[in-house]
Amino acid sequence: FPTRRSSDLVMITGDHKDTAVAIGKELGIISDASQAITGRELDALSDEELDAAVEKYSVYARVQPEHKVRIVNAWRRKGAITAMTGDGVNDAPSIKSADIGVGMGITGTDVTKNVADMVLSDDNFATIVNAVGEGRRIYDNIRKAIQFLLASNMSEVLGVFFATLLGFTLLNPVHLLFINLITDCFPADR
């Protein structure tokens, strides 16, 4: 499950609280029933109270579609990037409210697939976990490439900039192209 880099997994279900707690414990989402709350208990909370308590709960049981939207919005108000998965018409409003809505491709309804930002073709949660990991690797690689290019080319940029200010030519365009070819191509192969 996505536990690295402060990813929080939350289970929101229409199932009975005891069932949801048992599944949550089995999956390692929660350690005890105090981390679960029901839709009826959510009704008693104002939006401000929910905002204060949303991080305390990882399992939400017996919830209605409007509860799911409230939960997603509470996480968003906390500054979290939210992703919501679902397959039924009742999941569509919360999938639409989330930053990233994920519909199920096999069991999902057409409504859910249409409002989703992404459709999971195999209905497998592990695919989402793998995609998040791959996305993080791509992001890290892009960041490293930009750092390398800035670091390796900064001397060229500064040299040409100050030479231009002082009124003389430090490097011709052909020289710059040759330097870039040598310094940027070989490290790119690694």
How should each PLM-predicted stretch be described?
Residues H16-L27, E66-I71, G88-A98:
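Acidic, divalent-metal-coordinating active-site segment for phosphoryl/phosphodiester hydrolysis
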Residues S7-V10, Y57-V59:
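Short active-site oxyanion
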Residues G14-K17, I37, G88, G108:
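Residue-level "edge-of-site" marker
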Residues S31-A83, A98, G103-R190:
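Membrane-embedded transport module
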Residues F1-S6:
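Short, small-residue-biased leader/transition segments that mark boundaries at the very start
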